[in-house]
C-alpha cells in the first residue's frame, strides 16, 4: 500500500504542484482518494472522510449514486461520443427550460468556466459593448476576463489574480463591492457596460448572502441602463432549490449559467436564456461557441438521471433539513465565540474572528489562520 505522502512526492514530478487544480492542494500534502460512495471518501491508506465539499460542488446526490451509475452504464454500451446531435440532448435542454426560470434555450458546454466565458461573449455581442462588471470575491471560472478580485482558490493563494493575464484582457472588467448598490450604479449608469455577472450568493468567498432587496436593485440597475444580467448559478443552481437562487430570491437573469450539479459528477455545464438572446449564438447567430465534447452523451445521460432525482418532491426538503441540522450544531458549538455563520440550503460557511460578513472585504478580515487550523483538525477527525 502506498501512502498519501509517497503519492504526493511522485505526483510533484509529473503534475504541476502535484495536483490538477490548486484548490486540491493541502499542507503538508493532500490525501489521495481511492474510491467514494454516498457521503464518504476513502483514501489510499484506508482513511475515510465525510465529504462536506461534495467534490467541490457536483456531488449533491452523493458519490457513486446507483441510479446515475446505471444510467451511465446504459449509455456506455451505446457509445461515448459521436460528434453528432442526439435525441437525449434535446430532452435535457427541454427539461432545463422547464425547470430554470427565464430559460427557453440553452447551449451545453463542459465546465462552469466555459459557461461564464460564453455568456460574457454573448452579452458583449448583443449589446455591442465591452465592459463587464463583477463583484469582489465573486469567482466565475479560470478565464482571463474574470480573474479580478476573485474568490475560490485565488482568494487563498498569493495574489488576487494571476500572472500571464495581459492588462488588455482585464481593462474592461470592473469589480465592485457586493451588497453596495451605489457602487454598482455609479459604474453601470455610464451606459457602456455590456453585462453584470453575479453569483447571487458569493460562494467562493464562503457563503455571502445578498441583503434583502439587493438582487432586485441589481436587476433594476441593469435593465435601466441596457445592461444584461448574467446570473451565475454554477454553484447555487439546483442547490438552494430546484429553480436555483433565481427562484429563491425572485430575481431572473437575462443569461443564466449552470454547471456542477447538473452533470451528476460528469463534466457538464450550460448557459441559457430567452430565445431572443440565445438565437444570437452560432450557428443561427454571430456569437461563436463550439466544443468537441459539448452535449457529450455520457454526461447528458448522467444529467438526465440527476434531474429525475432532483425533481422528486422529497429531495429539497431533505437538503434543507440536513443543512439546518448541520448549521444548528455548528452554531451551538460556536455561539460563545466570535464567529459568523451563514447558510442556504446545501451550503454554509463559518467565519472566525468576525461577527458579520456582507461582502468580500468583511470576509478578508476573518481569521483565516484559525480557519486553516480548524480545517486541519477536521481532516484528522475524518471530515
Regions found by a protein language model. Give the residues of each.
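Conserved N-terminal phosphate-binding loop of PLP-dependent enzymes in the Aspartate aminotransferase
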Residues: 1-383
Amino acid at each position: 500500500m502506498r501512502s498519501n505522502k509517497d503519492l504526493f512526492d511522485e505526483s510533484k514530478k509529473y503534475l504541476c504542484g502535484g495536483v490538477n487544480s490548486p484548490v486540491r492542494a493541502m499542507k503538508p500534502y493532500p490525501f489521495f482518494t481511492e474510491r467514494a460512495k454516498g457521503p464518504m471518501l476513502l483514501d489510499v491508506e484506508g482513511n475515510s472522510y465525510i465529504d462536506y465539499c461534495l467534490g467541490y460542488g457536483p456531488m449533491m446526490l452523493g458519490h457513486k449514486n446507483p441510479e446515475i451509475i446505471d444510467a451511465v452504464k446504459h449509455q456506455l454500451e451505446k457509445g461515448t461520443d459521436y460528434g453528432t446531435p442526439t435525441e437525449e440532448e434535446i430532452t435535457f435542454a427541454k427539461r432545463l427550460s422547464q425547470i430554470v426560470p427565464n430559460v427557453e434555450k440553452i447551449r451545453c458546454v463542459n465546465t462552469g468556466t466555459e459557461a461564464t466565458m460564453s455568456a460574457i461573449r454573448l452579452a458583449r455581442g448583443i449589446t455591442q459593448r465591452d465592459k463587464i462588471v463583477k463583484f469582489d470575491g465573486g469567482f466565475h471560472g479560470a478565464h482571463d476576463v474574470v480573474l479580478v478580485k476573485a474568490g475560490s482558490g485565488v482568494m487563498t493563494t498569493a495574489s488576487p489574480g494571476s500572472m500571464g493575464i495581459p492588462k488588455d484582457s482585464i481593462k474592461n472588467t470592473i469589480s465592485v463591492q457586493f451588497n453596495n448598490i451605489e457602487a454598482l450604479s455609479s459604474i453601470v449608469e455610464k451606459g457602456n457596460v455590456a453585462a453584470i455577472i453575479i453569483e447571487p450568493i458569493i460562494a467562493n468567498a464562503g457563503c455571502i448572502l445578498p441583503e434583502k432587496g439587493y438582487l432586485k436593485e441589481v436587476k433594476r440597475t441593469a435593465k435601466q441602463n441596457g445592461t444584461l444580467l448574467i446570473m451565475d448559478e454554477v454553484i447555487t443552481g439546483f442547490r438552494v432549490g430546484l429553480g436555483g437562487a433565481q427562484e429563491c430570491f425572485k430575481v431572473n437573469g437575462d443569461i443564466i449559467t449552470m454547471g456542477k450539479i447538473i452533470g451528476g459528477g460528469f463534466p457538464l455545464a450550460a448557459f441559457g436564456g430567452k430565445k431572443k438572446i440565445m438565437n444570437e449564438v452560432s450557428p443561427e447567430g454571430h456569437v461563436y461557441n463550439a466544443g468537441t465534447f459539448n452535449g457529450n452523451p455520457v454526461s447528458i445521460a448522467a444529467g438526465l438521471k440527476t434531474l429525475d432525482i432532483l425533481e422528486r418532491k422529497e429531495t429539497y426538503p431533505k437538503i434543507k433539513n440536513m443543512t439546518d441540522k448541520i448549521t444548528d450544531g455548528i452554531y451551538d458549538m460556536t455561539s460563545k465565540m466570535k464567529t459568523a455563520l451563514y447558510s442556504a440550503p446545501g451550503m454554509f460557511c463559518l467565519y472566525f474572528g468576525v461577527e458579520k460578513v456582507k461582502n468580500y472585504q468583511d470576509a478578508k478580515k476573518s481569521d483565516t489562520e484559525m480557519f486553516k487550523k480548524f480545517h486541519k483538525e477536521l481532516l484528522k477527525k475524518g471530515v
